[in-house]
UniProtKB/Swiss-Prot annotation:
It comes from Symbiobacterium thermophilum (strain DSM 24528 / JCM 14929 / IAM 14863 / T). The gene is ispF. PROSITE patterns: ISPF (PS01350). A divalent metal cation binds at D8, H10, H42. GO terms for molecular function: 2-C-methyl-D-erythritol 2,4-cyclodiphosphate synthase activity; metal ion binding. Its cofactor is a divalent metal cation. Its EC number is 4.6.1.12. Pfam families: YgbB. This is 2-C-methyl-D-erythritol 2,4-cyclodiphosphate synthase.
């Protein structure tokens, strides 16, 4: 078994939907990015790719490529799972931490776990999603952005 780690951060801006863990969350601001800017899934994809030694999401889905403009990160995650399968790997579990002052994501975690688990091909109980604040410190504390960390375990080969 192999383990990978991922991190992502995006700026909060008005006029964009807020998508975290594949779930749209009501908010006056969303995350700025080339795709839907889902920091939770971006961190997870980097963790999965890193575990398999396959680089990072910027390598596979460059922000300069118009093909990925506005992409749904659940679709990108499906592609990452496909890349793992081509190399003989499969996801086992993942653990994601979202760092944001608001909104509170607790009510949305069950849906996130279901959606991510379905794409990874694992039971939702194998998908851990936690949230914390930055205690009003730094860019996250000033509510300028949201960050996420992820670890993922893969098996195979």
């Amino acid at each position: 078994m192999l383990i990978g780690f991922g991190y992502d951060v995006h700026r909060l801006v008005p006029g964009r939907p807020l998508v975290l863990g594949g779930v749209e969350i009501p908010s006056k601001r969303g995350l700025e990015g080339h795709s839907d800017a889902d920091v939770a899934l971006h961190a997870l994809m980097d963790a999965l790719l890193g575990a398999a030694g396959l680089g990072d999401i910027g390598t596979h889905f460059p922000p300069t490529d118009p093909a990925w403009a506005g992409a749904n990160s659940l679709d990108l995650l499906r592609r990452v799972v496909g890349l793992l399968a081509e190399e003989g790997y499969r996801p086992v579990n993942c653990d994601i931490t979202v760092v944001a002052e608001r909104p509170k994501i607790g009510p949305y975690v069950p849906a996130m776990r279901e959606r991510i688990g379905a794409v990874l091909g694992v039971e939702p109980r194998r998908v851990s999603i936690k949230a914390t604040t930055n205690e009003q410190m730094g860019f996250v504390g000033r509510e300028e952005g949201i960050a996420a960390y992820a670890v993922a375990l893969i098996a195979g080969r």
